Amino acid sequence: MQFDYIIIGAGSAGNVLATRLTEDPNTSVLLLEAGGPDYRFDFRTQMPAALAFPLQGKRYNWAYETEPEPFMNNRRMECGRGKGLGGSSLINGMCYIRGNALDLDNWAQEPGLENWSYLDCLPYYRKAETRDMGENDYHGGDGPVSVTTSKPGVNPLFEAMIEAGVQAGYPRTDDLNGYQQEGFGPMDRTVTPQGRRASTARGYLDQAKSRPNLTIRTHAMTDHIIFDGKRAVGVEWLEGDSTIPTRATANKEVLLCAGAIASPQILQRSGVGNAELLAEFDIPLVHELPGVGENLQDHLEMYLQYECKEPVSLYPALQWWNQPKIGAEWLFGGTGVGASNHFEAGGFIRSREEFAWPNIQYHFLPVAINYNGSNAVKEHGFQCHVGSMRSPSRGHVRIKSRDPHQHPAILFNYMSHEQDWQEFRDAIRITREIMHQPALDQYRGREISPGVECQTDEQLDEFVRNHAETAFHPCGTCKMGYDEMSVVDGEGRVHGLEGLRVVDASIMPQIITGNLNATTIMIGEKIADMIRGQEALPRSTAGYFVANGMPVRAKK
């Protein structure tokens, strides 16, 4: 089998590339996905409110676990990644957050990455998006990804939580993806007008999958990339339960889009990476790149949970006898409780003046429950997810064998710097202050977790060690740049090799201030134009907020 391009991984970036490259009818593309189709009749991936379900099994989740995390009481921590058409956009929380403009301006400070500034990238965010409120300087009106805004009157807790943040002295922002990210406001979501999850399989592949020049293979587990000298010329994979490899050749390029955990694994199995690691598994060295699998970053978060004094939380929706009605309303009308991910309010703040842009993120949820649906509190409640955004902690992803089915060694080194501990202590104390503003007085009952007895630095640190969880935002393991630990250049091309790019969250040099999905899609759109040799979209002239030493919050 011969194709112009072979794309490994039908996720948030791979589906963008498959769709854009096949717009040229003379370009043939093979898209390989280790998971299955995104079954449209499966409410677990299609109903926004069911977002916890795909994380509980292994049909749609790789369900990786970390090595014992040394600064987290040696816990082995969850590292869920999407499996199936759509990748992690098939199982994520559907929060459409782009990050802060200064994240990208910070990337663009690196020599060779100048065209990754916010104003260079904004046109590609807009190209990908159809926002239900229409287009403007910041938002698109006819892109493949449906973005839904929060509507007034959904749940009184959302507005009360935003108002509480404002009462605590922080800014209000009408659009976390617009002129000003800093502050509290409504949160956009990747949900269609029909109340369905807007994964990249739905948004992108639906328009491309009938094209004769696109071949999609699901249940295709990539074993390794085939090289001729320093040139990538094809891919070998295992289909279904078969142990006999299938191979195809790429006339132009192999595009690795398997995500921050799998992309470095595939490079390592293919002979690209740290020479000592590859020698350990007798993998012939194709090209030494010590940065492959290093620079692993993530967002860590924790929940502050409160009893709700009024019966306005989502607690009744957790009762089995209410679920048939909720399901029917969603299935036939695309409305009701099932049509939202219920992360409809949030915010970004600076915890201290030393941060030039927000370093703490909030997601508000009108029910007290773990992200994966476990440990639901048996009463009306609400919670605040809070975590730091740009931890200095760095980890790694390293293969444990040549077997593509074996999970790698993943270590994030969460909380390995003093800055991490200071940020979490600040975050918990600021959150408590916000939760005790007048706007929440009528709703706020007792603090369920961590509990009022948890007050000292030592007590807060111990709570974080035992209870903080991943926000499922791994990135950085094939970082873009030109230093000795970089893996790809500013166009995603792997250093020292030909015909091979990495295009996914692994190429982010530094983690962004917010959820990763929107930016991963943007990366796919931007590099698709580079691959096609098209001129970049004209740089935006939109304005954006920079704090420039402004006080963190208004004095009361």
UniProtKB/Swiss-Prot annotation:
Activity regulation statement: Activated by high osmotic strength.
Gene: betA
Pathway(s) where this gene product acts: Amine and polyamine biosynthesis; betaine biosynthesis via choline pathway; betaine aldehyde from choline (cytochrome c reductase route): step 1/1
A biological process from GO: glycine betaine biosynthetic process from choline
Active site: H473
GO molecular function: betaine-aldehyde dehydrogenase (NAD+) activity; choline dehydrogenase activity; flavin adenine dinucleotide binding
Binding residue positions for FAD: 4-33
EC top class, as a word: oxidoreductase
Enzyme Commission number(s): 1.1.99.1, 1.2.1.8
Superkingdom of origin: Bacteria
Gene3D superfamilies documented for this protein: FAD/NAD(P)-binding domain, Glucose Oxidase, domain 3
The protein, known as: Oxygen-dependent choline dehydrogenase
Keyword NAD recorded: yes
Field pH dependence: Optimum pH is 7.5 for choline dehydrogenase and is between 7.5 and 9.5 for glycine betaine-aldehyde dehydrogenase.
Induction: By osmotic stress. Choline is required for full expression. Oxygen and choline exert their control via the transacting DNA-binding proteins ArcA and BetI, respectively.
Annotated Pfam families: GMC_oxred_C, GMC_oxred_N
Cofactor: FAD
GO cellular component, one term: membrane
Function, as annotated: Involved in the biosynthesis of the osmoprotectant glycine betaine. Catalyzes the oxidation of choline to betaine aldehyde and betaine aldehyde to glycine betaine at the same rate.
Family: Belongs to the GMC oxidoreductase family.
Keywords, comma-separated and alphabetical: Cell membrane, FAD, Flavoprotein, Membrane, NAD, Oxidoreductase, Stress response
